[in-house]
C-alpha cells in the first residue's frame, strides 16, 4: 500500500530533483524505467481497452519536500509561504493508479511527464503511436 500523504510531500516541478526522487521511489518499482520522453507505461491484460492516465510533475514553484497538516481527514499545506499548492490532483491520480495496478485491474496505465509545462509527455506519446493505443476504447484521466 502506498502512502498518499508521503507522496503529497514532494514538490516536483518538471526536471527537478524532487521529481526524480518521486519517480525513483514511487513509479520505477512498478513501472520500470520511463520512455525517452519521461513517460511511464504499465500494461495489465492482453490488449486492454481502457487507459488510465495521470502525470508526475506538479505546478510547484520550487523543488523539495513540503510540510502537510492532516486534520479531520483533510490534507492541507502547513505553510502557504513555502508551498504554492498541494499538488493533489495528479498525485492522487498516481496513488490511485498504483493501487489499481496492485489490485490487478486490467488496463494501460500511463504516468506522463511534463504535463504542467505544455502537455509534452502526452503529446510525445501520441506522436510515437504505440501499438496498444489502437486497442483503446477510452482514456480516463485522473487529473481533476
Predicted regions and their residues:
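N-terminal, Lys/Arg- and Ser/Thr-rich interaction peptides
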Residues: 1-6
Amino acid at each position: 500500500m502506498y502512502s498518499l500523504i508521503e507522496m503529497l510531500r514532494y514538490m516536483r516541478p518538471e526536471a527537478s530533483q524532487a521529481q526524480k526522487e518521486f519517480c525513483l521511489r514511487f513509479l520505477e518499482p512498478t513501472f520500470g524505467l520511463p520512455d525517452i520522453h519521461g513517460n511511464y507505461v504499465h500494461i495489465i491484460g492482453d490488449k486492454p481497452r481502457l487507459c488510465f492516465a495521470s502525470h508526475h510533475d506538479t505546478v510547484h514553484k520550487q523543488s523539495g519536500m513540503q510540510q502537510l497538516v492532516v486534520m479531520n481527514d483533510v490534507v492541507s499545506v502547513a505553510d502557504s509561504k513555502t508551498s504554492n499548492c498541494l499538488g493533489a490532483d495528479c498525485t492522487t491520480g498516481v496513488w490511485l493508479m498504483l493501487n489499481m495496478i496492485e489490485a490487478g485491474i486490467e488496463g494501460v496505465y500511463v504516468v506522463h511527464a511534463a504535463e504542467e509545462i505544455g502537455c509534452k509527455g502526452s503529446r510525445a506519446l501520441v506522436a510515437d503511436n504505440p501499438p496498444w493505443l489502437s486497442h483503446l476504447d477510452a482514456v480516463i484521466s485522473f487529473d481533476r
